């Protein structure tokens, strides 16, 4: 581990030199590449340097104990050694986590797709609850959220809502929301007070850059149509809505949220690019040895990941067996406890795999 950390430290210093080289500064591609490489390793290098400083202090303090010290001085040095030993252990644990394989998509912005699934009106109302939950969570994280496409119902639910989330680490946290979310509650329309079970699905796609997904114009069929409101009635006499079909994959994306056809096409392209990128990622993931996969499901969208039980005010994440009696707070966007628990669990699994 320490050989690897030392080579990272040396590479970091070399990147410092390269980033001040006029030849690199004049080459925007190299400048971007080296800047990203340095940014990716910065935290690891800084923690490693802190660890080396603590180790030096620890060794010096241990050597002091070998000198003839009075009782008071001996006690002070012993206390310092204990504190440094604790810091050393904490930094070692942190370095182990920092050296774990990183998801290359973690720093990306995301496209989130929420759909009402089994349960009719109630599933669509729950899809709206999930959208509000993510919007509040994004706001608390300082991320920007933008609706790309929404198919709303007369009761205020969503058959489907697609939105982008832009901000530092958006994918690294929201990727754990991939899957089927189940709700158990008494619907507002239920006169007998019976609890119904409904489901909404969530897909979280890393937003792809143009350079990552090469889409040729000849591979896209563009259809335009008049946008419609809840229930399907036409609300726009101009042909501003856009449907894009990617012919090689059969992926179809529609957008009618904007009044401008150009803006709708831009938004639809963003979703199309993300879906194509995600398709390739899913195919590549399927080829991996099953034993290398994380135990925390972040890929299978048919997997039931969480249950929201309203009568008992309980939320259970089935992947790690976490149950919280905080349903109202979670629906208000307070997802940190769940997501942090999933991250810690995944890190533990990755460490176990590395040891094996």
From Swiss-Prot:
It is found in: Cytoplasm. Its main location: cytoplasm. Methylated by PrmC. Methylation increases the termination efficiency of RF1. Gene3D superfamilies: 3.30.160.20, 3.30.70.1660, 6.10.140.1950. InterPro entries: PCRF, Pep_chain_release_fac_I, Pep_chain_release_fac_I_sf, Prokaryotic/Mito_RF, RF-1. Keywords: Cytoplasm, Methylation, Protein biosynthesis. GO terms for cellular component: cytoplasm. The modification N5-methylglutamine is found at residue 233. SMART domains: PCRF (SM00937). GO terms for molecular function: translation release factor activity, codon specific. Peptide chain release factor 1 directs the termination of translation in response to the peptide chain termination codons UAG and UAA. PANTHER family: LD18447P. Belongs to the prokaryotic/mitochondrial release factor family. This is Peptide chain release factor 1. It comes from Halalkalibacterium halodurans (strain ATCC BAA-125 / DSM 18197 / FERM 7344 / JCM 9153 / C-125).
């Amino acid at each position: 581990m320490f050989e690897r950390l030392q080579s990272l430290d040396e590479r970091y210093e070399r990147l410092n030199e390269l980033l001040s080289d006029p030849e690199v500064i004049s080459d925007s591609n190299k400048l971007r590449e080296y800047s990203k490489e340095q940014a990716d390793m910065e935290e690891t290098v800084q923690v490693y340097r802190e660890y080396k400083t603590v180790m030096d202090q620890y060794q010096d303090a241990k050597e002091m104990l070998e000198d003839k010290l009075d009782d008071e001085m001996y006690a002070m040095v012993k206390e310092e050694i204990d504190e440094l030993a604790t810091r050393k252990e904490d930094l070692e644990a942190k370095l182990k986590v920092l050296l774990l394989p990183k998801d290359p998509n973690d720093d990306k912005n995301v496209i989130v797709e929420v759909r009402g699934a089994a349960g009719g009106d109630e599933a669509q109302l729950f899809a709206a609850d999930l959208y509000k939950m993510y919007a509040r969570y994004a706001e608390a994280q300082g991320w920007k959220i933008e609706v790309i496409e929404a198919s709303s119902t007369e009761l205020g639910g969503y058959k489907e809502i697609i939105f982008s989330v832009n901000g530092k680490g958006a994918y690294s946290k929201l990727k754990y929301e991939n899957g089927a979310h189940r709700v158990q509650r008494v619907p507002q329309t239920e006169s007998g007070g019976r609890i119904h079970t409904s489901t909404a699905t969530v897909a979280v796609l890393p937003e792809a850059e143009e350079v990552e997904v090469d889409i040729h114009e000849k591979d896209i069929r563009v259809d335009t149509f008049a946008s419609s409101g809840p229930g399907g009635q036409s609300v726009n006499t101009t042909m501003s809505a856009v449907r894009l079909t990617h012919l090689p994959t059969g992926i179809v994306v529609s957008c009618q949220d904007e009044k401008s056809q150009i803006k709708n096409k831009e938004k639809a392209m963003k979703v199309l690019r993300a879906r194509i990128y995600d398709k390739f990622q899913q195919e590549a993931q399927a080829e991996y040895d099953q034993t290398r996969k994380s135990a925390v499901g972040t890929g299978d969208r048919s997997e039931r990941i969480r249950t929201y039980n309203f009568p008992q005010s309980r939320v259970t994440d089935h992947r790690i067996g976490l149950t919280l009696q905080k349903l109202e707070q979670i629906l208000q966007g307070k997802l940190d406890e769940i997501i942090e628990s999933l991250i810690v669990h995944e890190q533990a699994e990755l460490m176990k795999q590395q040891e094996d």
